[in-house]
Amino acid sequence: MLTNIAKKIFGSRNDRLLKQYRKSVARINALEEQMQALSDADLQAKTAEFKQRLADGQTLDGILPEAFAVCREASRRTLGMRHFDVQLIGGMVLHDGKIAEMRTGEGKTLVATLAVYLNALAGKGVHVVTVNDYLASRDAGIMEPLYNFLGLTVGVIISDMQPFDRQNAYAADITYGTNNEFGFDYLRDNMVTDQYDKVQRELNFAVVDEVDSILIDEARTPLIISGQADDNIQLYQIMNTVPPHLVRQETEEGEGDYWVDEKAHQVILSEAGHEHAEQILTQMGLLAENDSLYSAANIALMHHLMAALRAHSLFHKDQHYVIQDGEIVIVDEFTGRLMSGRRWSEGLHQAVEAKEGVEIKRENQTLASITFQNYFRLYTKLSGMTGTADTEAFEFQSIYNLETVIIPTNRPVQRKDFNDQIFRSAEEKFEAVVKDIEECHKRGQPVLVGTTSIENSELVSHLLQKAGLPHNVLNAKEHEREALIVAQAGKVGAITVATNMAGRGTDIVLGGNLKHQTDAIRADETLSDEEKQAQIAALENGWQAEHDKVMEAGGLHIIGTERHESRRIDNQLRGRSGRQGDPGSSRFYLSFEDPLLRLFALDRAAAILNRLAPERGVAIEHNLLTRQIEGAQRKVEGRNFDMRKQVLEYDDVANEQRKVIYSQRNEILTSKDISDLMQEIRSDVVSDLVDTYMPPDSMEEQWDIPTLENRLAAEFRLHEDIQSWLKADNAIDGQDIKERLIERIENEYAAKTELVGKQAMADFERNVMLQVIDNQWREHLAAMDYLRQGIHLRSYAQKNPKQEYKREAFTMFQDLWNGIKFHIASLLTSVQIEQNPVAVVEEQPIGNIQSIHSESPDMEELLGQSQTDLVTEAFNPDGTDFSPEALEARGQIVHRNDPCPCGSGLKYKQCHGKLA
């Protein structure tokens, strides 16, 4: 109550921000006539002027009014679109690093140009992030004439681009692309072995379109670059036969073998279930008599069993995945889109493949990963746009430090949102849905029907076919036709069935999207120019009449067949209607068989239903029920927020480690001289080794000199008689021994360096260091995954799992860093440099650098190999023959003192040439 009184007196935070922005709008509008008076050349010259002013010390905020005025006038001339005042406010919100909530149809794509142009003037690059390749290419294509007119370059990142093209796209002033591509490029850049293979620049400023979809809905989905791990494919097939023999419990405490917790999306084996599963596995010969699934030796069996149970109980065809070309393709539960190329982890994808009888592909091992939460927080400045952010404003603020500003519409919203209609059963609900669609179709009113799964969209489609109603289905299976179907969903009498929010980013124009239709005619090569003009003219004349007819029928009618877990998704569906002041309406049809009501609102809602006791087919509309449903949604939203926050808290630990590793890696890549770093590493490793066998402040009787000598000989090929040193000088201590050993190693290393040349040795060091870091980091990620999967069990010992995870992860990271230094020092000091007379061959380019990571050998194995093998595997992962005979047969010649064509950095006579 006090809050409401304060808002009435002082206005809300949103009101105060809008008031400030409107003052800037007035300054921009005051410049409009001045900009209109400029010639094209003078208007274009403004970009160079702004850049010079920034170089002279002026700020982006200082030139904002003029830059926005220039962008608006340039847009009017090149695109035929002038920014409204509310769009200017949206542009300022984006520039300030906030989220602009703008309703559907308010021109978010055009709004972005203002902030993008202003920030691109700084020359550090701007990324415009969209949800799919189509929208990235479309938006870049639409806005490129504007940016080019203003002297700025535009690049687009799409999934199948080559590295060289990606570099060019990122080098542009403005780069459009998807969240996945930006994130994966960041990870790939931190796996390269040559700094010139990187594609991204610094992460400066990003404008995220559909920011709620990317930063909220996909926040729990990490980006992972992986390679195949060793795995027993046959075990998935065998384990797939176990779940049908186990009995599912009706209730958590009921009889049976396992309980499916749909709320938490988990499967829990009961004590009886464990015993039953052990009996089955024993009969199959997978488990020894009287052995337990809990024993350490049977962890893999338990892993496969739980994966099979989850695949059978929680993941359903045409809801969570589809089968396409003999492969399991995941369906995004929020958008209904296919997520080609993505796979579930922890053996789940293989278990689903076994269940469906398709080819089982090996489990993957993580090489690099990052969540969207941590990737987007790497940008110096981040902003976003969406039609629905206010319900998640707290999460945006607490996790991303992004404030949400609600931008008023250019015209008042005329959409009517009717009360929910609730039925006893799903059958009654869908009958009412079809009846509503039929009535709309008769009066020519277009209808968009939203469903929460492919299964339901196909059910609605089947019912519409029975009723003889023509319609389009838009779900993951129709991804290619998505934009076309959505664009024409506003035609007279059109019926479109859409899974979730598929088609976001494409406006539904009442009367149909004229531009899409005219573009299709212009692209038709079978028509002559005269025929094209005639068809376009007829289309334009008929469009206005169709538009007016749809307006009279009430505009676009939205039907929701189910409430989503999040109110935001429901609002997105509603928001497809009533764009730019158009008429429209919306209504949700629910039943007590819907998952949301069944899982979260059943008890109290059922009591209300029993009191009202309607007849079959009669809907209930009651404020109590509506509040109960909204309460259930808030409960689920809170739970999902907690889960995302928990993911972030755990990933923050790995993120800090990732930053250190990537920073060190980048330093190695970019440094011309790493000799000081190498010297420091050798010194640290020798000191640690001596401290291990001659602990500081210990008695001489506690020293283990023989083992120290053996380790030095085995790991560093350093053969020193330390015991004779001690006999010769009673005053010698651990520090003296360290200094002598370090001196010996440095002298030998200096001799090697002189033999091959300082630059060649530096290149060799750099490549070995990067390979060691990548291998050790990969193993560390796997260990962190295992730690995280089991850390919750610490709570049974009255310990805080998060604190335990942080503590153990820190210890593991210290071990990782020590291991990296040890392997680098060991490998490089044990390298033997030989000189042999060799034939001469011609240099050829290095092979695919990326294969170093996918086929990199185990470092422990490398330690026991000869120098020739080491060089061959470290710098020639694909096994190309660089021997003199092979190169001569290929007609290639290299001089004996030239660099070896394998890319090791050594001279040919000291590398593959010595095989001769």
UniProtKB/Swiss-Prot annotation:
Where is the protein situated, by its record's location annotation? Cell inner membrane; Cytoplasm
Q: Which cofactor does it need?
A: Zn(2+)
Q: Where does ATP bind?
A: Q87, G105, E106, G107, K108, T109, D507
**Protein residues bound to Zn(2+):** C900, C902, C911, H912
Q: What is its EC number?
A: 7.4.2.8
Q: Which CDD domains match?
A: DEXDc_SecA, SF2_C_secA
Q: Which reaction does it catalyse?
A: ATP + H2O + cellular proteinSide 1 = ADP + phosphate + cellular proteinSide 2
What role is this protein assigned? Part of the Sec protein translocase complex. Interacts with the SecYEG preprotein conducting channel. Has a central role in coupling the hydrolysis of ATP to the transfer of proteins into and across the cell membrane, serving both as a receptor for the preprotein-SecB complex and as an ATP-driven molecular motor driving the stepwise translocation of polypeptide chains across the membrane.
What family is reported? Belongs to the SecA family.
Q: What name is this protein filed under? A: Protein translocase subunit SecA
The species this protein was found in: Neisseria meningitidis serogroup C (strain 053442)
Recall the taxonomic lineage recorded for the source organism: Bacteria, Pseudomonadati, Pseudomonadota, Betaproteobacteria, Neisseriales
Gene that this sequence comes from:
secA
